[in-house]
Amino acid sequence: MKIVIQRVSEASVAIEGEIVGAIQKGLLLLVGFGPEDGQEDVDYAVRKITQMRIFSDAEDKMNLSLLDIKGSILSISQFTLFANTKKGNRPAFTEAAKPEMASQLYEQFNQALSAFCPLERGVFGADMKVSLVNDGPVTIILDTKNR
């Protein structure tokens, strides 16, 4: 499971010109699943994302978590995080989980996160337009296989 975590002051996702999810201060997550990912990866990622101290405190130090600031999450499925660019000029996506499996894990992931904080989301497999204002910028890549 690979996740690009971006600290944002606002973010939204639109499908066919209609905004289907929007947040203010919080995290934009681009989430991809590999064929060996499972519930253990989901649990690990949820724990890390909700407890990671990447928001500034009163002294401008990154000491606060998403939960501390009562922030929100915008979750976007992103199979392209598993792109293989070793050969040629066109990325291969054979290292990504099959859509049926990835869709199920994405649902589990979002459901688990929503128990901790407000969550908005894109639509799995849809062509989406994501807008964000990156705060910092702070962008972190989490790979659940690198623990």
UniProtKB/Swiss-Prot annotation:
UniProt family annotation: Belongs to the DTD family.
HAMAP family named among the record's database cross-references: Deacylase_Dtd (MF_00518)
Cellular component annotations (GO), alphabetically ordered: cytoplasm
Documented EC number(s): 3.1.1.96
Stretch forming the signal peptide: none
Subcellular location: Cytoplasm
Keyword terms of this UniProt record: Cytoplasm, Hydrolase, RNA-binding, tRNA-binding
Name this polypeptide is given: D-aminoacyl-tRNA deacylase
Lineage, opening ranks: Bacteria, Bacillati, Bacillota, Bacilli, Lactobacillales
Subunit structure as annotated in this protein's UniProt entry: Homodimer.
Reactions the enzyme catalyzes: glycyl-tRNA(Ala) + H2O = tRNA(Ala) + glycine + H(+); a D-aminoacyl-tRNA + H2O = a tRNA + a D-alpha-amino acid + H(+)
Domain notes: A Gly-cisPro motif from one monomer fits into the active site of the other monomer to allow specific chiral rejection of L-amino acids.
Functional note: An aminoacyl-tRNA editing enzyme that deacylates mischarged D-aminoacyl-tRNAs. Also deacylates mischarged glycyl-tRNA(Ala), protecting cells against glycine mischarging by AlaRS. Acts via tRNA-based rather than protein-based catalysis; rejects L-amino acids rather than detecting D-amino acids in the active site. By recycling D-aminoacyl-tRNA to D-amino acids and free tRNA molecules, this enzyme counteracts the toxicity associated with the formation of D-aminoacyl-tRNA entities in vivo and helps enforce protein L-homochirality.
TM region positions: none
Single GO term (MF): tRNA binding
Main location: cytoplasm
Gene3D superfamilies linked to this entry: D-tyrosyl-tRNA(Tyr) deacylase (3.50.80.10)
Keyword flag Ligase: no
GO biological-process terms attached to the record: D-amino acid catabolic process
Cross-referenced CDD domains: Dtyr_deacylase
Motif (Gly-cisPro motif, important for rejection of L-amino acids): 136-137
